[in-house]
Amino acid sequence: MKMKSIIVCASLALLCSAADVHALFGLDSVQSAAGEKVISALTIDLSGLKYYSAPKEALAPLDLLAKEATNLDKNISCSELEPFVDFVISNAYTGLVWELPCSNGVFGAMAVGVLTNTFEERKLFCSPTLPDHAVYSTLRFSKELSSRGKDICEKMFSAPEGVLTRDYSLNYDIIAPNEVSGAYYCYTNTRIYVQGTVKGRRVMMTGTLMEEPSSVSQKGALIDSKYPGLYFYSTEKGLTLPGAGWMETKMDYYRSFTISVELDNDRYAFATLSWLSAGWKGINVLRTHHIYEVLREIIKELQTYGGSGLDLDELQKCIASGENLSDDKVEAEYKKYCSFCEKKAGSSFLSVNVDAYKRIFNKKDLEDLPKELRRALVVQEQVRILKKTPTWSISE
């Protein structure tokens, strides 16, 4: 069996949440800086897109931030971010799709564009006190391990203008399964936070640096295609992909960054980029277009928060309510999820690959699920209800 298309990783960045407003937000095409039309990524196969090479000099500030991620004594000035900030601003409206320099066999992709949120709202999505799994369906679970979230928020959100402020935390994450391979992974990472003013514009950045290779892949599957982002998680190692169930894969390398640059009229230029290597026995089977596919899905999800009329204060309250539910209430809600899973596993009318879900369904996995993962499921569903897209909590 060829390895090339076995794995397309389910998630790239914990805070990878942005987009190219032209090529990704539904326009048929846009005139690029080079005078050619870039077709919408929503209407063609992404592997056929025209990729432009991101200049190494523009990415140099990211190497510096990664190198000094945990060395807060190192003085990094706002001016040192200028090459990357200038690149993002100058390409925010071009609609171009970017590939990153390949290093040691690791490929990467980047999207640059403009989104509609106030800069204050953008801060919310960069907050280490907001569990990422409550916002992005590409994550099963996310936890800040260093217990410094509130301190980091106070430091970042009260930072004086003109001064580059940095901090970091240690995080643990479990990504959602990929719908092709059925693989999901767990890993620890260093999350970095950066805020400052560059050429008179407020800038906020986050980065994710994987500490070591991920856990071995475990099997997962979409429960029903009517409910994107709703998965069943097996504890069995391997892939759900038929014929490759025995294959135990890993994420070997992962690094990502996002940047928000304040523009005007409640708009900001945004770039999100990731390098990722994943595969079997050190063989990287991911390519640029695989990575960009995942960026696109995260981008589409962010649209439900930006310019949709969703009250972000209500979102915060909704998440806090779920995080503070009693254990008994969480258990009562979790039973609804279990009933939903069992019902779907016994149905012959699923609008999804029935074999994939039925093949891995095991009631014992539901019974043995740790409490913190049960709570995460409940919080995710409460957010869906707020967005008017409930799944397992409704009767069918």
Predicted regions and their residues:
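Bacterial N-terminal signal peptides
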Residues: V8-C16
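Terminal "cap-and-tail" regions of soluble proteins that handle hydrophobic small molecules
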Residues: L24-E396
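Sec/Tat signal peptide C-region and signal peptidase I cleavage site
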Residues: S17-A23
